[in-house]
């Protein structure tokens, strides 16, 4: 990777410290509350083989609160032996449930990652359940070292990304994503697409709201259809099934069957099935 390919400062994620540094000389300094640059440092990536074990068993240190989040969302460092990585921690106690999505949104974050893995799509960073994290039970998701100035609306016409966007569009229909904003589509330094912020998923009613309507009427990718066919021919993995109640599992299979039978991306005749804000 050349120097031109590296992030510039505008692309770094910013975090706000949970507590100001304990320095008497800086007491009362307004700069303590300002966001600070964060430099990515990890020995395992968002979906390496060891990542899930590190997230499940590692020591969790809270680094700061992520700004602009509607729910309590924290940047943490997870260390397990010689391995370490930053992660996004969403504790249940920090949630602000919606009228149609009760508490436990973090479980849907985990379930979405498991569904992506089960279908072989690799769209969602490794996400696990942690009951012993600093602020209580919640999800830990491997942090993606993305180009944060990029989002769906800056990458939607890139030929090298469109195939992954098409798979994500189909995946969101199956997972019933009600909040696929443009900023929830990340591109990492290897130009790989990642889907984050997946807490509003798996409702029993059709709730899809997404910015990705570009492929309406076009065929769903064959690899996605084959994956759905396999999924419908066998029981759901136990760890995924345990995160959903029976009605949610049945609705998941119904949506998968509908996408498989239809074979094409649907239209939005209302023009209102989009999230807000768009990014």
Q: What do the PLM-derived regions correspond to, one by one?
A:
Residues 1, 36-39, 66, 231:
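Detector for methionine-enriched segments
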Residues 3-23, 27, 79, 102, ...:
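C-terminal catalytic region of ATP-dependent kinase domains
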Residues 21, 35-37, 46, 86, ...:
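Proline-rich intrinsically disordered, low-complexity coils
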Residues 13, 29-40, 145-169, 261-279:
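Repeat-unit-sized solenoid/scaffold elements
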Residues 53-155, 160-161, 165-178, 182-183, ...:
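Conserved ATP-binding subdomain of kinase catalytic cores across diverse folds
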Residues 46-64, 176, 261-272:
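Short loop/turn hinge sites at secondary-structure boundaries
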Residues 2, 39, 43, 51, ...:
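Residue-identity detector for threonine
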Residues 10-55:
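Juxta-kinase regulatory segment immediately upstream of eukaryotic protein kinase catalytic domains
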């Amino acid at each position: 990777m050349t120097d031109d390919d590296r992030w510039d400062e505008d692309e770094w994620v910013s975090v706000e410290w949970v507590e100001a540094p304990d320095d008497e000389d800086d007491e009362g300094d307004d700069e303590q509350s300002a966001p600070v640059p964060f430099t990515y440092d990890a020995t395992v990536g968002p979906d390496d083989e060891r990542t899930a074990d590190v997230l499940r068993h590692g020591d969790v240190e809270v680094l700061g609160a992520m700004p602009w989040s509607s729910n309590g969302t924290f940047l943490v460092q997870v260390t397990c032996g010689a391995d370490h990585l930053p992660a996004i921690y969403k504790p249940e106690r920090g949630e602000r449930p919606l009228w149609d999505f009760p508490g436990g949104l973090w479980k849907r974050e985990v379930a979405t990652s498991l569904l992506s893995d089960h279908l072989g799509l690799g769209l969602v960073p490794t996400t696990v359940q942690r009951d012993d994290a600093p602020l209580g039970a919640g999800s830990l998701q491997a942090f993606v070292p993305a180009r944060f100035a990029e989002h769906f609306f800056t990458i939607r016409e890139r030929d090298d990304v469109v195939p992954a966007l098409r798979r994500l569009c189909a995946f969101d229909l199956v997972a019933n994503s009600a909040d696929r904003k443009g900023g929830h589509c990340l591109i990492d330094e290897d130009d790989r697409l990642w889907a984050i912020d997946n807490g509003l998923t798996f409702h029993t009613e059709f709730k899809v709201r997404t910015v990705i309507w570009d492929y309406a009427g076009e065929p769903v990718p064959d690899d996605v259809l084959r994956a759905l066919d396999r999924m419908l021919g066998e029981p759901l993995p136990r760890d995924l099934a345990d995160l959903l109640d029976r009605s949610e599992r049945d609705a998941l299979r119904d949506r998968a069957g509908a996408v498989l039978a239809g074979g094409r991306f649907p239209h939005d005749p209302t023009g209102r099935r989009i999230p807000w804000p768009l990014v």
